[in-house]
Amino acid sequence: MIDTLKDRLKAKPKKWLVTGVAGFIGSNLLEELLQWDQAVVGLDNLSTGYRYNLEDVKKEVGHKKWSRFTFYEGDIRNLTDCRKACEEVDYVLHQAALASVPRSIEDPIATSQSNIDGFLNMIVAARDAGMKRFVYAGSSATYGDHPELPKREDKMGHPLSPYAVTKYVNELYADVFARTYGLECIGLRYFNVFGRRQDPNGAYAAVIPRWIDSFLNLVEPTIHGDGETSRDFCYITNAVEANLLAATTDNAEALNKVYNIAYGSRTTLNQLYQIIREEVSQYKPEAKTIEPIYGLFRQGDIRHSLADISRAKELLGYDPKFDVKQGMAESIKWYINKT
Protein backbone atom coordinates (compact mmCIF):
# COMPACT_ATOMS: atom_id res chain seq x y z
CA MET A 1 0.00 0.00 0.00
CA ILE A 2 2.80 2.42 0.86
CA ASP A 3 4.48 1.83 -2.52
CA THR A 4 1.23 2.60 -4.34
CA LEU A 5 0.89 5.81 -2.31
CA LYS A 6 4.47 6.77 -3.13
CA ASP A 7 3.82 6.38 -6.86
CA ARG A 8 0.59 8.40 -6.61
CA LEU A 9 2.24 11.30 -4.75
CA LYS A 10 5.29 11.34 -7.02
CA ALA A 11 2.97 11.60 -10.01
CA LYS A 12 1.00 14.43 -8.42
CA PRO A 13 3.08 16.19 -5.71
CA LYS A 14 1.44 18.06 -2.83
CA LYS A 15 2.60 20.77 -0.45
CA TRP A 16 3.08 19.69 3.16
CA LEU A 17 3.71 21.51 6.44
CA VAL A 18 5.77 19.66 9.04
CA THR A 19 5.91 21.36 12.44
CA GLY A 20 8.82 20.42 14.67
CA VAL A 21 10.67 19.73 11.42
CA ALA A 22 14.15 19.94 12.98
CA GLY A 23 13.28 17.35 15.61
CA PHE A 24 13.50 13.57 15.60
CA ILE A 25 10.20 12.56 13.96
CA GLY A 26 9.82 15.81 12.03
CA SER A 27 13.18 15.50 10.26
CA ASN A 28 12.40 11.91 9.28
CA LEU A 29 9.06 13.00 7.82
CA LEU A 30 10.87 15.76 5.93
CA GLU A 31 13.39 13.32 4.49
CA GLU A 32 10.73 10.88 3.29
CA LEU A 33 8.56 13.59 1.75
CA LEU A 34 11.50 15.11 -0.12
CA GLN A 35 12.54 11.66 -1.36
CA TRP A 36 8.98 11.38 -2.71
CA ASP A 37 9.42 14.69 -4.61
CA GLN A 38 6.96 16.62 -2.42
CA ALA A 39 7.14 20.33 -1.56
CA VAL A 40 7.63 20.81 2.19
CA VAL A 41 7.36 23.78 4.52
CA GLY A 42 8.98 23.31 7.93
CA LEU A 43 8.29 25.23 11.14
CA ASP A 44 10.51 24.93 14.21
CA ASN A 45 11.72 27.23 16.98
CA LEU A 46 14.86 25.08 17.44
CA SER A 47 14.31 24.71 21.19
CA THR A 48 14.38 20.90 21.06
CA GLY A 49 15.11 20.49 17.34
CA TYR A 50 18.49 21.08 15.73
CA ARG A 51 19.83 22.57 12.51
CA TYR A 52 22.20 19.63 12.17
CA ASN A 53 19.16 17.36 11.70
CA LEU A 54 18.17 19.51 8.73
CA GLU A 55 21.74 19.42 7.41
CA ASP A 56 21.68 15.64 7.69
CA VAL A 57 18.46 15.48 5.65
CA LYS A 58 19.99 17.79 3.04
CA LYS A 59 22.95 15.44 2.72
CA GLU A 60 20.66 12.41 2.38
CA VAL A 61 18.31 13.81 -0.28
CA GLY A 62 20.69 15.90 -2.41
CA HIS A 63 20.51 19.49 -3.64
CA LYS A 64 17.69 19.09 -6.17
CA LYS A 65 15.20 17.53 -3.75
CA TRP A 66 16.32 19.88 -0.95
CA SER A 67 15.32 22.87 -3.10
CA ARG A 68 11.67 21.87 -2.55
CA PHE A 69 12.00 22.65 1.18
CA THR A 70 11.24 26.01 2.83
CA PHE A 71 12.19 26.50 6.49
CA TYR A 72 10.58 29.00 8.83
CA GLU A 73 12.20 29.52 12.21
CA GLY A 74 9.09 30.26 14.21
CA ASP A 75 7.07 29.22 17.23
CA ILE A 76 3.72 27.43 17.39
CA ARG A 77 2.92 29.58 20.44
CA ASN A 78 2.78 32.52 18.00
CA LEU A 79 -0.39 32.46 15.87
CA THR A 80 1.20 34.71 13.22
CA ASP A 81 4.01 32.19 12.71
CA CYS A 82 1.45 29.40 12.36
CA ARG A 83 -0.59 31.34 9.80
CA LYS A 84 2.51 32.12 7.73
CA ALA A 85 3.54 28.45 7.68
CA CYS A 86 0.06 27.31 6.60
CA GLU A 87 -0.15 29.41 3.44
CA GLU A 88 -1.08 27.34 0.36
CA VAL A 89 -0.40 24.04 2.15
CA ASP A 90 -2.40 20.87 1.45
CA TYR A 91 -1.57 18.79 4.53
CA VAL A 92 -0.28 19.47 8.05
CA LEU A 93 1.80 16.92 9.96
CA HIS A 94 1.90 18.52 13.41
CA GLN A 95 4.81 17.11 15.43
CA ALA A 96 5.97 20.17 17.41
CA ALA A 97 5.64 19.68 21.17
CA LEU A 98 7.56 19.38 24.42
CA ALA A 99 7.43 15.58 24.38
CA SER A 100 8.70 14.57 27.80
CA VAL A 101 6.91 13.18 30.86
CA PRO A 102 9.68 14.20 33.34
CA ARG A 103 9.92 17.68 31.86
CA SER A 104 6.16 18.14 32.16
CA ILE A 105 6.29 17.19 35.83
CA GLU A 106 9.11 19.69 36.37
CA ASP A 107 7.54 22.47 34.30
CA PRO A 108 3.84 21.90 33.57
CA ILE A 109 3.28 25.52 32.47
CA ALA A 110 5.84 25.42 29.64
CA THR A 111 4.51 22.03 28.55
CA SER A 112 0.95 23.36 28.46
CA GLN A 113 1.97 26.49 26.54
CA SER A 114 3.64 24.45 23.80
CA ASN A 115 1.37 21.43 23.71
CA ILE A 116 -2.05 23.00 24.27
CA ASP A 117 -1.74 26.70 23.31
CA GLY A 118 0.59 25.82 20.43
CA PHE A 119 -1.70 23.06 19.21
CA LEU A 120 -4.71 25.38 19.28
CA ASN A 121 -2.83 28.05 17.31
CA MET A 122 -1.82 25.45 14.74
CA ILE A 123 -5.26 23.94 14.25
CA VAL A 124 -6.88 27.41 14.02
CA ALA A 125 -4.32 28.44 11.38
CA ALA A 126 -4.96 25.20 9.46
CA ARG A 127 -8.71 25.75 9.59
CA ASP A 128 -8.44 29.36 8.42
CA ALA A 129 -6.08 28.40 5.58
CA GLY A 130 -8.63 25.91 4.21
CA MET A 131 -6.34 22.95 4.87
CA LYS A 132 -7.34 19.55 3.48
CA ARG A 133 -6.30 17.57 6.52
CA PHE A 134 -4.64 17.99 9.91
CA VAL A 135 -2.63 14.99 11.15
CA TYR A 136 -1.15 15.37 14.62
CA ALA A 137 1.15 13.51 16.98
CA GLY A 138 -0.67 11.99 19.92
CA SER A 139 0.79 9.78 22.63
CA SER A 140 0.22 6.45 24.35
CA ALA A 141 0.66 8.44 27.58
CA THR A 142 -3.03 9.38 27.28
CA TYR A 143 -3.99 5.85 28.40
CA GLY A 144 -2.73 6.70 31.87
CA ASP A 145 -3.57 4.15 34.54
CA HIS A 146 -5.98 2.05 32.48
CA PRO A 147 -4.83 -1.51 33.24
CA GLU A 148 -6.02 -3.36 30.15
CA LEU A 149 -3.50 -4.74 27.64
CA PRO A 150 -3.35 -4.34 24.74
CA LYS A 151 -4.39 -0.67 24.74
CA ARG A 152 -7.45 0.04 22.62
CA GLU A 153 -8.27 3.54 21.41
CA ASP A 154 -11.66 3.71 23.14
CA LYS A 155 -10.54 2.66 26.64
CA MET A 156 -8.83 5.39 28.66
CA GLY A 157 -7.66 5.74 32.24
CA HIS A 158 -6.60 8.74 34.31
CA PRO A 159 -3.51 10.62 33.02
CA LEU A 160 -0.35 10.15 35.08
CA SER A 161 1.50 13.31 34.02
CA PRO A 162 0.88 16.87 32.80
CA TYR A 163 2.27 15.74 29.42
CA ALA A 164 -0.45 13.09 29.14
CA VAL A 165 -3.10 15.72 29.93
CA THR A 166 -1.85 17.99 27.13
CA LYS A 167 -1.95 15.22 24.54
CA TYR A 168 -5.48 14.25 25.56
CA VAL A 169 -6.59 17.88 25.29
CA ASN A 170 -5.19 17.88 21.72
CA GLU A 171 -7.50 14.99 20.89
CA LEU A 172 -10.50 16.83 22.35
CA TYR A 173 -9.72 19.96 20.34
CA ALA A 174 -9.27 17.96 17.13
CA ASP A 175 -12.60 16.22 17.68
CA VAL A 176 -14.40 19.53 18.25
CA PHE A 177 -12.76 21.17 15.21
CA ALA A 178 -13.79 18.22 13.05
CA ARG A 179 -17.43 18.37 14.21
CA THR A 180 -17.73 22.16 14.39
CA TYR A 181 -15.70 23.36 11.40
CA GLY A 182 -15.45 20.29 9.18
CA LEU A 183 -11.64 20.12 9.38
CA GLU A 184 -10.50 16.56 8.71
CA CYS A 185 -8.32 15.52 11.67
CA ILE A 186 -6.45 12.32 12.45
CA GLY A 187 -4.48 11.72 15.66
CA LEU A 188 -1.64 9.22 15.91
CA ARG A 189 -0.96 7.88 19.40
CA TYR A 190 2.74 7.08 19.16
CA PHE A 191 4.10 4.25 21.30
CA ASN A 192 7.79 4.86 22.10
CA VAL A 193 9.07 5.75 18.65
CA PHE A 194 12.84 5.33 18.17
CA GLY A 195 15.42 5.56 15.41
CA ARG A 196 17.83 7.79 13.52
CA ARG A 197 18.22 11.40 14.70
CA GLN A 198 16.77 10.75 18.14
CA ASP A 199 18.78 12.90 20.54
CA PRO A 200 20.84 10.93 23.12
CA ASN A 201 21.80 14.03 25.10
CA GLY A 202 20.16 16.10 27.81
CA ALA A 203 18.16 15.43 30.94
CA TYR A 204 15.04 14.39 29.01
CA ALA A 205 16.61 12.12 26.40
CA ALA A 206 14.66 8.96 25.52
CA VAL A 207 15.93 5.65 26.83
CA ILE A 208 17.07 4.05 23.55
CA PRO A 209 19.44 6.74 22.22
CA ARG A 210 20.71 7.34 25.76
CA TRP A 211 21.56 3.65 26.23
CA ILE A 212 23.13 3.36 22.78
CA ASP A 213 25.31 6.36 23.60
CA SER A 214 26.26 4.81 26.97
CA PHE A 215 27.28 1.50 25.37
CA LEU A 216 29.30 3.23 22.66
CA ASN A 217 31.16 5.14 25.40
CA LEU A 218 31.46 2.03 27.61
CA VAL A 219 29.40 3.60 30.40
CA GLU A 220 26.90 1.58 32.47
CA PRO A 221 23.33 2.55 31.46
CA THR A 222 20.73 3.17 34.17
CA ILE A 223 17.48 1.19 34.20
CA HIS A 224 14.71 2.93 36.14
CA GLY A 225 13.01 0.38 38.40
CA ASP A 226 13.40 -3.41 38.21
CA GLY A 227 13.67 -3.60 34.42
CA GLU A 228 10.36 -5.41 34.01
CA THR A 229 8.56 -2.24 32.92
CA SER A 230 7.50 -2.89 29.32
CA ARG A 231 6.88 -0.81 26.21
CA ASP A 232 5.71 -1.29 22.64
CA PHE A 233 8.71 0.17 20.79
CA CYS A 234 8.02 1.51 17.30
CA TYR A 235 10.78 2.12 14.73
CA ILE A 236 10.68 5.53 13.06
CA THR A 237 9.97 4.19 9.55
CA ASN A 238 6.71 2.68 10.83
CA ALA A 239 5.66 6.04 12.32
CA VAL A 240 6.57 7.98 9.16
CA GLU A 241 4.47 5.66 7.00
CA ALA A 242 1.54 6.02 9.41
CA ASN A 243 1.62 9.81 8.98
CA LEU A 244 1.62 9.59 5.19
CA LEU A 245 -1.21 7.05 5.15
CA ALA A 246 -3.28 9.17 7.56
CA ALA A 247 -2.78 12.35 5.54
CA THR A 248 -3.81 10.82 2.24
CA THR A 249 -6.40 8.15 3.02
CA ASP A 250 -9.55 8.23 0.90
CA ASN A 251 -11.41 6.13 3.46
CA ALA A 252 -14.11 8.41 4.91
CA GLU A 253 -14.52 6.06 7.86
CA ALA A 254 -10.87 6.68 8.83
CA LEU A 255 -11.32 10.42 9.36
CA ASN A 256 -11.65 12.20 12.71
CA LYS A 257 -10.33 9.32 14.76
CA VAL A 258 -7.23 8.51 16.80
CA TYR A 259 -4.97 5.53 16.09
CA ASN A 260 -2.38 3.54 18.00
CA ILE A 261 0.91 3.64 16.11
CA ALA A 262 3.24 0.90 17.31
CA TYR A 263 4.52 -2.51 16.26
CA GLY A 264 2.09 -4.44 18.42
CA SER A 265 4.53 -6.33 20.65
CA ARG A 266 5.84 -5.78 24.17
CA THR A 267 9.50 -5.54 25.24
CA THR A 268 10.68 -5.16 28.84
CA LEU A 269 13.51 -2.77 29.65
CA ASN A 270 15.67 -5.77 30.60
CA GLN A 271 15.01 -7.32 27.18
CA LEU A 272 15.68 -4.00 25.48
CA TYR A 273 18.98 -3.75 27.34
CA GLN A 274 20.04 -7.17 26.03
CA ILE A 275 19.02 -6.29 22.45
CA ILE A 276 21.00 -3.05 22.45
CA ARG A 277 24.05 -4.63 24.11
CA GLU A 278 24.06 -7.46 21.58
CA GLU A 279 23.81 -5.09 18.60
CA VAL A 280 26.43 -2.62 19.86
CA SER A 281 28.82 -5.49 20.69
CA GLN A 282 29.05 -6.32 16.99
CA TYR A 283 30.78 -2.96 16.52
CA LYS A 284 32.35 -2.63 19.97
CA PRO A 285 33.07 -6.04 21.57
CA GLU A 286 33.97 -4.46 24.95
CA ALA A 287 30.28 -3.55 25.38
CA LYS A 288 29.46 -7.23 26.03
CA THR A 289 30.67 -7.01 29.62
CA ILE A 290 28.73 -3.88 30.59
CA GLU A 291 26.05 -4.44 33.24
CA PRO A 292 23.22 -2.01 34.02
CA ILE A 293 22.72 0.15 37.09
CA TYR A 294 19.21 -0.16 38.52
CA GLY A 295 17.75 3.10 39.79
CA LEU A 296 14.43 4.34 41.14
CA PHE A 297 11.18 4.06 39.22
CA ARG A 298 10.46 7.28 37.32
CA GLN A 299 7.51 9.38 38.46
CA GLY A 300 4.64 9.59 35.97
CA ASP A 301 5.64 6.51 33.97
CA ILE A 302 3.08 3.83 33.19
CA ARG A 303 4.14 0.29 34.12
CA HIS A 304 3.23 -1.62 30.95
CA SER A 305 2.34 -0.62 27.43
CA LEU A 306 1.19 -2.68 24.45
CA ALA A 307 -0.84 -1.41 21.51
CA ASP A 308 -3.76 -2.95 19.69
CA ILE A 309 -3.02 -1.69 16.16
CA SER A 310 -6.01 -3.35 14.47
CA ARG A 311 -7.87 -0.05 13.91
CA ALA A 312 -4.89 1.51 12.10
CA LYS A 313 -4.43 -1.64 10.03
CA GLU A 314 -8.08 -1.84 9.06
CA LEU A 315 -8.86 1.83 8.36
CA LEU A 316 -5.49 3.31 7.33
CA GLY A 317 -3.80 0.28 5.80
CA TYR A 318 -0.99 0.62 8.38
CA ASP A 319 1.42 -2.31 8.15
CA PRO A 320 4.57 -1.83 10.29
CA LYS A 321 7.60 -3.51 8.72
CA PHE A 322 10.24 -3.14 11.45
CA ASP A 323 10.07 -4.95 14.80
CA VAL A 324 12.21 -3.78 17.72
CA LYS A 325 15.24 -5.93 16.78
CA GLN A 326 15.22 -4.90 13.12
CA GLY A 327 14.70 -1.26 14.06
CA MET A 328 17.48 -1.43 16.64
CA ALA A 329 19.94 -2.84 14.11
CA GLU A 330 19.13 0.06 11.75
CA SER A 331 19.34 2.64 14.55
CA ILE A 332 22.68 1.47 15.90
CA LYS A 333 24.14 1.32 12.39
CA TRP A 334 23.09 4.96 11.95
CA TYR A 335 24.57 6.07 15.31
CA ILE A 336 27.83 4.22 14.55
CA ASN A 337 28.12 5.94 11.17
CA LYS A 338 27.54 9.34 12.78
CA THR A 339 30.19 8.95 15.50
Where are these regions (language model features)?
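C-terminal substrate-binding subdomain of Rossmann-fold SDR/epimerase-dehydratase oxidoreductases
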Residues: 9-10, 16, 70, 215-339
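Short-chain dehydrogenase/reductase
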Residues: 112, 160-171, 202-209, 233, ...
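Short glycine/proline- and charge-enriched loop/turn segments
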Residues: 149-158, 206, 293-296, 309
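N-terminal Rossmann-like NAD(P)+-binding domain of SDR-like oxidoreductases, especially those catalyzing
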Residues: 1-193, 243, 247, 318, ...
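Glutamine-centric residue-chemistry signal
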Residues: 94-95, 198, 229
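Hydrophobic alpha-helix immediately C-terminal to the catalytic Tyr-X-X-X-Lys motif of short-chain
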Residues: 169, 173, 177, 207, ...
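Residues in well-ordered alpha-helical elements
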Residues: 80-83, 90, 102, 109, ...
